[in-house]
Regions:
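Mature catalytic domains of secreted/periplasmic carbohydrate-active enzymes
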Residues: 1-194
Length: 194
């Protein structure tokens, strides 16, 4: 058997760096439980360029970013979770930078790195909110599901931003909407892990 050209290219990437930075970092625990307070996150000197440069200098071709782990905390400002994400950290409120993932992506591009995302299907925060594992029925949903004052409404109405229909549970719709955000608003995402 011979690998396809795409498979051979993937093998040639060599090392993939894994960046797992989130709310659990500030609670000295491996996994969060969904009840952690984002306002505890207030680092000084956060330098995503330094992170990306370190990966590039180490010979990595791509960084896999944990954008949401099992605790449900997100490194970006999601329309679908407005409480347990980077926008609610003390550092975001102090600096006005509500989207750490966007900074990481920009730094990765600056240093020639591809970006992948790790998105955990488990979500302790949404379980506490009654969304994850609530045994809801699969009903047809439109993805993206526009929220109040959604900045994408014009693009959806004009057809510039595609939509699709899918039968999903409450959490399935939440997850699909977040993946839609991540895969349409951050440029080229090379790989997705669950």
């Amino acid at each position: 058997l011979r690998p396809t050209e795409g498979q051979a290219d993937y093998i040639d990437w060599g090392q993939i760096g894994f960046l797992h930075y989130g709310i659990n970092t500030y609670y000295n625990q491996e996994w969060g439980h969904g009840n952690e307070d984002p306002s505890r996150i207030d680092p000084t000197g956060l330098d995503t360029d330094q992170w990306a440069k370190s990966f590039a200098d180490g010979g990595f071709k791509m960084i896999m970013v944990t954008v949401k782990h099992h605790d449900g905390f997100e490194l970006y400002d999601s329309r679908y979770n407005t409480e347990h994400d980077w926008a609610n950290t003390a550092v975001a409120k102090r600096t006005g930078e509500k989207d750490l993932f966007r900074k990481i992506v920009a730094s990765a591009k600056k240093y020639g790195l591809k970006v992948g995302i790790y998105y955990s299907p488990a979500d302790s925060y949404m379980e506490r909110k009654g969304v994850w594992g609530n045994n809801s029925a699969r009903v047809e949903r439109t993805i993206p599901t526009l929220v109040e004052n959604d900045d994408r409404a014009g693009k959806v109405a004009s057809g510039k931003l595609p939509t699709f229909k899918y039968k999903a549970t409450d959490y399935g719709a939440y997850m699909l909407n977040q993946l839609y955000e991540l895969l349409t608003e951050y440029g080229d995402i090379s790989e997705v892990w669950f």
